[in-house]
């Protein structure tokens, strides 16, 4: 069985789906691995490292893709990409990656039409046996870290309190909105840098997690618990949204750094920080909105841009994981490896396994994942 990966085509995507370490592990299991020349260059992996573990290197993408049984990706190709699996992969080839099926309708439909079997790493279920495959968590962890680093770079003051002969510098105050994997890592990183940190979330269970990191949990009184069985947050009621907005408007002006991480799978990110709130913040404050790919949590934030409103810097950079491409590639590639070793039995994907089926998006020319199929049907029905 031939497993391949090409260089990522998405702008500013510097991660790679196969690291030399994982290539070596796959080869030891009997798979033939081929990657495109310089595939890991921007993540700090040289071709020599791949060759050393037995990987074949090719500078001809068409040759790689047309002969592949399994294609590993970080992000999906565009339907217009040159040498895309959508055009040149053989029918029945398997594609595994962060395919963003909620957003990339054209890709998923084209993959089904091409008769590709696709697995979305976003759909790894949040269960114990799948933890080592959980790419969303591994990447979100690094995104939370990087969000704080970006904030500290654009903030014109120090994070920790410093007492010097020339005077005392006060510690900055950081507020993290949304305490999932990214939010918890943002809290931990800001604490390590010496900031005074608070966390906010609509899920009551996160209070203990925030406090375990030495941060303060802040929330409106009579908090409505919006945690679903999946562990993700659900949408709040109109009444709670109004109460939430009033509460955040009251407290946000006391913070120098705000990190927003709130997302709802398959839906637009909730708006948390209004323009009026931004106007109330201290001049020179910094907001990092890591949810701009799904609409953003901050009014006025723009995808992949840094803007200033009312003297506040708003960072809406996409794909923060690519700013630490080496480590994010190591973790993501290992997630892929763990999924493959779990799902493959005698060279075939075990479609009888519920975990494998949950991740399956297209097969035999059809969109087989009912969540995605219903999502696309609703979009079509609504014009």
From Swiss-Prot:
Transmembrane regions listed in the UniProt entry: none
Superkingdom, taxonomy of origin: Bacteria
One MF annotation (Gene Ontology) recorded for this entry: NADP binding
GO biological process: NADPH regeneration
One GO cellular component term noted in the UniProt record for this chain: plasma membrane
EC number: 7.1.1.1
CDD domains membership: Rubrum_tdh
InterPro entries hit by this protein: AlaDH/PNT_CS1, AlaDH/PNT_N, AlaDH/PNT_NAD(H)-bd, NAD(P)-bd_dom_sf
Binding site for NAD(+): 131-134, 181, 201-203, 231
This protein's UniProt keywords: NAD, NADP, Nucleotide-binding, Translocase
SMART domains cross-referenced by the UniProt entry: AlaDh_PNT_C, AlaDh_PNT_N
PROSITE patterns assigned to the protein according to its UniProt record, in alphabetical order: ALADH_PNT_1
Catalytic reaction(s) noted: NAD(+) + NADPH + H(+)(in) = NADH + NADP(+) + H(+)(out)
Matching Pfam families: AlaDh_PNT_C (PF01262), AlaDh_PNT_N (PF05222)
Homology family: Belongs to the AlaDH/PNT family.
Function (record text): The transhydrogenation between NADH and NADP is coupled to respiration and ATP hydrolysis and functions as a proton pump across the membrane.
Matching PANTHER family: NAD(P) TRANSHYDROGENASE, PROTON-TRANSLOCATING NAD(P)(+) TRANSHYDROGENASE
Subunit structure comment from the entry: Heterotrimer of two alpha chains and a beta (PntB) chain; in Rickettsia, the alpha chain is made of two subunits (PntAA and PntAB) and forms a dimer.
The protein's name: NAD(P) transhydrogenase subunit alpha part 1
Species of provenance: Rickettsia prowazekii (strain Madrid E)
Gene: pntAA
